[in-house]
C-alpha cells in the first residue's frame, strides 16, 4: 500500500506511523491490491467543519470524512475475484481535536479513537455506509473485527502503539456510537453536530 499522511492540523500527539499501519492492515484484510494508494489528511476543526458543510450539507465539525476515488470491490486475491490493478482509493480526513473530545466521552485515548476512525474511514472508501440499520450493523461489526484483529496483529509483531482498550466504548456498536453522537451534540463545547 502507498499511504501518505498530511498533518495540516497543528495538533500534537497524532501518531502518523500508527495511522498508516492500521489503514494498511485494514485494506490488506479487505483484499485490496497491495499497490493501491490512499491518503490521510489530519485537519483542524474549522477545516473539517467547512468540508462537512460543503460535501454533506451538515453544520459543524465531525470526526472523520472519506472521499472515495476509484470504485473498488474487495477481494482481488480471491480465486473467483477480478484482478484489478492498483487504484487510488481516496482520502480519509480526520480531526484529532474533535476525536480527542469523543475519545474522552467514550472512555479511551486519542490514539485508539484515531485508529477506530481510520478503519471507519477505510470502509467508507470501499463503499460501506451506515444509512440504514442493516448496513450500519454490518459496517460497525466489520469495523470492530478489523480493529480488534489489528491490535492482535500489532501485538504479534511486537509493536506497541497503545494497549488494546477494553470497555463498552472501545469497540462500539452502531447504537453505542449513536449514544456518543448524542452526548457530543448535547455538549456545550460548540462543536456542533456529529456525522461520521
Swiss-Prot record:
Its main location: cytoplasm. The keyword Lipoprotein does not apply. The keyword Zinc applies. InterPro entries: MetalPrtase_cat_dom_sf_prd, YbeY, YbeY_CS. Keywords: Cytoplasm, Endonuclease, Hydrolase, Metal-binding, Nuclease, Ribosome biogenesis, rRNA processing, Zinc. Binds 1 zinc ion. One of its GO terms (molecular function) is RNA endonuclease activity. Gene3D superfamilies: Metalloproteases ('zincins'), catalytic domain. Its cofactor is Zn(2+). Its EC number is 3.1.-.-. One of its GO terms (biological process) is rRNA processing. It is an enzyme of class 3 (hydrolase). It comes from the Bacteria. Pfam families: YbeY. It is found in: Cytoplasm. GO terms for cellular component: cytoplasm. Single strand-specific metallo-endoribonuclease involved in late-stage 70S ribosome quality control and in maturation of the 3' terminus of the 16S rRNA. Belongs to the endoribonuclease YbeY family. PANTHER family: ENDORIBONUCLEASE YBEY, CHLOROPLASTIC. This is Endoribonuclease YbeY. It comes from Corynebacterium glutamicum (strain R). The gene is ybeY.
Amino acid at each position: 500500500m502507498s499511504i501518505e499522511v498530511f498533518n495540516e492540523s497543528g495538533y500534537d500527539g497524532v501518531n502518523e506511523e500508527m495511522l498508516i499501519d492500521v489503514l494498511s492492515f485494514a485494506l490488506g484484510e479487505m483484499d485490496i491490491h497491495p499497490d493501491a494508494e490512499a491518503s490521510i489528511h489530519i485537519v483542524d476543526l474549522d477545516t473539517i467543519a467547512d468540508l462537512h458543510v460543503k460535501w454533506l450539507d451538515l453544520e459543524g465539525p465531525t470526526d472523520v470524512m472519506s472521499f472515495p476515488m476509484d470504485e473498488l470491490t474487495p477481494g482481488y486475491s480471491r480465486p473467483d475475484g477480478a484482478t484489478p490493478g492498483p487504484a487510488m482509493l481516496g482520502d480519509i480526513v480526520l480531526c484529532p481535536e474533535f476525536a480527542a473530545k469523543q475519545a474522552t466521552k467514550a472512555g479511551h485515548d486519542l490514539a485508539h479513537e484515531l485508529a477506530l476512525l481510520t478503519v471507519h474511514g477505510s470502509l467508507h472508501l470501499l463503499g460501506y455506509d451506515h444509512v440504514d440499520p442493516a448496513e450500519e450493523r454490518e459496517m460497525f461489526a466489520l469495523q470492530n473485527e478489523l480493529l480488534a484483529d489489528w491490535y492482535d496483529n500489532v501485538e504479534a509483531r511486537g509493536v506497541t502503539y497503545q494497549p488494546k482498550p477494553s470497555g463498552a466504548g472501545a469497540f462500539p456498536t452502531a447504537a453505542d456510537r449513536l449514544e456518543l453522537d448524542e452526548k457530543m451534540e448535547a455538549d456545550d463545547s460548540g462543536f456542533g453536530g456529529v456525522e461520521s
